[in-house]
Amino acid sequence: MTQTIKKYLNDSFAARWTALVLVASMMFFAYMFVDVLSPLSTLLESTKGWTAENYGTFCSSEYFLNVFAFFLIFAGIILDKMGIRFTGILSGAVMVVGASIKLFAISDLFSPESGLYNFLNSFWTSFPPTAKLASVGFMIFGCGVEMAGVTVSKAIARWFKGKEMALAMGLEMAIARLGVFAVFRLSPYLSTALNEAMPTVVTPVLVCTILLLIGLIAYIVFTFMDKKLESQQGAADEEAEEQFKVSDIGKLFTSKTFLIVAGLCVLYYSAIFPFQKFATGMLESNLGLPTEKAAGLFSWFPIGAMVLTPFLGAFLDNKGKGATMLICGALLMIVCHLTFALIPLTKTIAYFAIILLGVSFSLVPAALWPSVPKLVEDRYLGSAYSVIFWIQNIGLMAFPIIIGLALDKTGGYTVPMLIFASLGILALVLGLWLKVEDKKNGYGLEEPNIKK
């Protein structure tokens, strides 16, 4: 007698990679919206009257509810209780709502004649009403995008378990970063598309809001595929996953290795995403470039990361060395930020530093996210990702404000870049510590994901 081997939908190469493209599409458009105003910070100052500090506070608002209302923790609980289909659709809908509020805030529809405008202008007068309402929208959007990031990570872990997980996560990150490249190129162009003499921040935000709707539709299509996979696998796997208890979160905060990973994450990403918000302005200031050219120069950063991350993910799947990759990524980031801080800048040096940062931004995420399932049980993997994202959000909220203040106080970018470099040094220390812990306890961070 021959034994029948049951095939599932995710055993199909075409099906699991189609699923990846669908969930990654939502993150592609989400990342576009996150940075749609990053190349236009100087335009916000000239058309909306925002200062650098106002802009930094606005950027930080994306993370406010995630940090202080503990929304990300709740998002992880929702994910572990309700599953990836419900949580993914919810996150996409929340992003669209937040984006729509932000769009209204910066449009001419939100005028000084409105009662809401006058109310928002009645307090904290140094922060314009447009910035206040845009920040509210960005807060809501931030809840959705972080929930989406956690959900997509768990979805990939489910569809690619025992397969090309690191490669899949690397490709998802690559597609998302292509969104950053696209918006740094597209946003300055869209700002002048209707009237070159009167650039506006409204058109880029409108286009990216529409794209968020398309991303939500793509995820809804994925949910039909996931429903079929669940029906094939039966209830056993899902039931095991649903045995999550809220008390399991306490295990994360008592795990030294998990906290090292979370600390490394917040330090590293706090030197990446806040820098991304100010990079165009830095290149404009230090190289004397117009906005479009400065944004175009920096747009090569996500492209470098996009190209390399899948290859590094494949290397991690087959050869391992995850902890070593984290250390190398932190080193390269330190070199990049010190270059911008201490070396007289030319376009050649700027390209070199940006490419270096792109390589760094390939190494760390490619190794970091696939390592988490090696440290925690599947039943609270969603909560583990949420806790990491929550801790990360604390840094992502704090450092745009710190950098904006440093810019207003010093009038230059040397101090901000030294702040970013110091974060890289601390991340390097934690990377070395993590490698020691892995060697001592045998977590398998240096081992390949695909077992032969």
Placement of each model-derived feature along the sequence:
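C-terminal ends and interior cores of transmembrane alpha-helices
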Residues: 93-126, 331-345
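Helix-to-loop junctions at the C-terminal end of transmembrane segments
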Residues: 70-84, 309-321
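A late C-terminal transmembrane helix in Major Facilitator Superfamily
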Residues: 378-410
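Flexible cytoplasmic inter-helical loops of multi-pass small-molecule transporters
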Residues: 221-247, 441-450
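C-terminal transmembrane helical hairpin of 12-TM major facilitator-type secondary transporters
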Residues: 322-368
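Extracytoplasmic gate region of multi-pass secondary transporters
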Residues: 37-41, 255-309, 369, 399
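Helix-loop-helix hairpin linking two adjacent transmembrane segments in secondary transporters
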Residues: 172-227
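Cytoplasmic helix-loop-helix junction between adjacent transmembrane helices
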Residues: 131, 137-175
